[in-house]
Amino acid sequence: MFEGKNLYHPFLGAKAVKNDFTIKDDNYYIITGANMAGKSTFLRSLGVNYILAMAGMPVFADQLKISRFRLFSSMRTTDDLTHGISYFNAELIRLEELLKFCRESAEGKCRKKSGEDNKEPLRTLIILDEILKGTNSLDKLNGSRKFLEAIAKQPVSGIIATHDLELSKMENDASGKFHNYCFEIDLGTDVTYTYKIQKGVARNQNATFLLNKILEKY
């Protein structure tokens, strides 16, 4: 369980837009939104404040209630030309590490100390920012859906930011584990960012709009 009131990223200071958010055990939150709308910063806010709380440090929220769990994030995957690892291959390696991490947590292996016979399982919270970017759109969607369906069978909760609006259809899954949230923008003569999370699926995108703004100059 994770319940934050007026939570924000510590690096933003006074200009931060604060958000409320609750994560329930065995539930998954698919977050959509335009570029620069606040998805990645929000994911980091959740992770950073959890780590601060577990370290006994002040948190950047009016209120934060948490359960004890293991945290796994995948935010900035990079390729490795030196070792012949492409971006997509690096993503697969990271997702395999995640699966192993979650299994070990569920089996209690991560907490087993030398000489102890008992194992104490621990839940996992995963924070994923736009997985499988290194492949085409359809392959990415199918792969992401298959991965989430598999991970949902384990004692795991997750927050997944994505540009794949089709992935939001997982909310209709019979399990009831998937929930849609978004960061919406307003498009007028310019783009207005609210940075406030809300229920639902993002309706507006800004890539073409902003590109047209650039093209108008030339």
Positions of predicted regions on the chain:
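ATPase nucleotide-binding head domains, primarily ABC-like/P-loop NTPase cores
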Residues: 2-218
